[in-house]
């Protein structure tokens, strides 16, 4: 990937982008083999690769500069504001909207928040784009309600210029610390969610719900998990850490009932709405802690799918899974290091199949899907 920001050493987030993408994939595959299955008889499937540019559906921009010259991007290594509105990770429609927003913020006279002086209002711009519809969800993260009047007054101009903006909200984050968002979300549009679609499965995205940032690869991840589950054909399964229900919605079938568990109520609301849109009646969701849910169960279904955050399952949940003894565990991980640690604690299981998905090109990160079978 040709990136001027990287060449100038002003942004090094994509620290591998100087390497040809094919070489990145080869190196990552070798590293993951050595980490996950160095001496095991495991079916290692070819990786699912990504486009090397224009693959992200979400931008998180710090609002820098001053009201008369706002900048959306980051601070570089020297502490200087760097506009990233033309970052090659973003599709052209996102780049165009981000560039327009820089000028729109200036015209609206909204002062960026200055973390050193603890003055100003606008902290972040969070932009999400539906790959399926091309529509946007735009969130302004502000220090206080003082910014609302200027945003509302100038919003018609913004939406007239970009009618694909479907959802607009203001998130209030009053704390002076490195926190992306606060508790209060104020919607400025009637529509409060964005609709995505993977493999003919509708996915509802709300402001605070986690959603994969590489939709083309995520679609293949969900399709692969569905295919593996259908090979097993369980009558019941759990989807722990289910988020907005991507795996559960794909895996539910007339003969497979799925229970999705996620601690974030907003994500569960999204998952439930998707299930209603699909007309699925053997799919249920609950806003619960996955470990506490497992602890409350006397037995497990034939298959448990887990998709934990970067910290992994943790000893409490791995111990519960050992005791509940499902025949299969399907583990999707964004952190292979913690996944390997968790699998070591699942002593009654052995890896049967592994495939990784390059959700994060130009970095060391990968999404890994592993099928574990009880010995």
Curated annotation (Swiss-Prot):
Q: Does the keyword Transferase apply?
A: yes
- Domain of life, per UniProt, equals Bacteria
Transmembrane residue ranges: none
Annotated residues that bind S-adenosyl-L-methionine are located at 212, 241, 262, 307
Q: Which reaction does this enzyme catalyse, per its entry?
A: uridine(747) in 23S rRNA + S-adenosyl-L-methionine = 5-methyluridine(747) in 23S rRNA + S-adenosyl-L-homocysteine + H(+)
Q: Which SUPFAM superfamilies does UniProt cross-reference here?
A: S-adenosyl-L-methionine-dependent methyltransferases
Stated EC number for the protein is 2.1.1.189
- Note one Pfam family from the annotation: tRNA_U5-meth_tr
Care to name a GO molecular-function term for this sequence?
4 iron, 4 sulfur cluster binding
Residues the record lists as binding [4Fe-4S] cluster: 3, 11, 14, 87
> GO annotations under biological process?
rRNA base methylation
Q: Which InterPro entries match?
A: 23SrRNA_MeTrfase_RlmC, MeTrfase_TrmA_AS, SAM-dependent_MTases_sf, U5_MeTrfase_fam
Active site location: 334
- Which UniProt keyword terms apply here? 4Fe-4S, Iron, Iron-sulfur, Metal-binding, Methyltransferase, rRNA processing, S-adenosyl-L-methionine, Transferase
Q: Which family does it belong to?
A: Belongs to the class I-like SAM-binding methyltransferase superfamily. RNA M5U methyltransferase family. RlmC subfamily.
Q: What does this protein do?
A: Catalyzes the formation of 5-methyl-uridine at position 747 (m5U747) in 23S rRNA.
- What PANTHER family does this protein's entry cite? RNA M5U METHYLTRANSFERASE, TRNA (URACIL(54)-C(5))-METHYLTRANSFERASE
Q: What is this protein called?
A: 23S rRNA (uracil(747)-C(5))-methyltransferase RlmC
Species the sequence originates in: Vibrio cholerae serotype O1 (strain ATCC 39541 / Classical Ogawa 395 / O395)
The gene that this protein is the product of is: rlmC
């Amino acid at each position: 990937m040709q990136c001027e920001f990287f060449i100038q050493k002003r942004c090094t987030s994509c620290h591998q982008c100087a390497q040809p993408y094919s070489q990145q994939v080869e190196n990552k595959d070798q590293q993951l083999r050595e980490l996950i299955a160095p001496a095991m008889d495991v079916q290692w499937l070819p990786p699912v690769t990504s486009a090397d540019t224009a693959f992200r559906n979400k931008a998180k921009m710090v609002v820098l500069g001053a009201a008369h010259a706002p900048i959306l991007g980051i601070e570089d290594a020297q502490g200087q504001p760097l506009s990233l509105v033309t970052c090659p990770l973003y599709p052209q429609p996102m780049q165009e909207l981000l560039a327009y927003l820089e000028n729109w913020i200036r015209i609206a006279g909204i002062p960026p928040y200055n973390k050193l002086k603890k003055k100003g209002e606008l902290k972040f711009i969070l932009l999400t784009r539906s790959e399926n519809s091309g529509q946007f969800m735009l969130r302004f993260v502000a220090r206080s309600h003082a910014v609302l009047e200027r945003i509302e007054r100038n919003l018609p101009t913004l939406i007239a210029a970009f009618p694909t903006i479907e959802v607009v909200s203001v998130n209030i984050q009053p704390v002076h610390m490195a926190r992306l968002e606060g508790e209060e979300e104020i919607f400025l549009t009637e529509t409060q969610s964005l609709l995505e679609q993977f493999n003919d499965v509708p996915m509802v995205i709300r402001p605070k719900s986690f959603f994969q940032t590489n939709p083309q690869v995520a679609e293949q991840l969900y399709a692969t998990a569905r295919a593996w589950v259908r090979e097993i054909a369980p009558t019941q399964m759990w989807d722990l850490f289910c988020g907005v229900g991507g795996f559960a919605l794909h895996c539910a079938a007339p003969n497979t009932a799925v229970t999705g568990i996620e601690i974030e109520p907003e994500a569960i609301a999204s998952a439930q709405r998707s299930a209603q849109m699909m007309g699925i009646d053997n799919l249920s969701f609950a806003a619960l802690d996955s470990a506490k849910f497992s602890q409350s169960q006397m037995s497990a279904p034939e298959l448990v799918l887990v998709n934990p955050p970067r910290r992994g399952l943790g000893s409490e949940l791995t111990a519960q899974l050992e005791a509940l003894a499902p025949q299969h565990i399907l583990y999707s991980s964004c952190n292979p290091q913690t996944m390997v640690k968790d699998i070591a604690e699942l002593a009654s299981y052995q890896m049967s199949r592994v495939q990784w998905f390059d959700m994060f090109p130009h970095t060391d990160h990968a999404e890994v899907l592993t099928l574990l079978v009880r010995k």
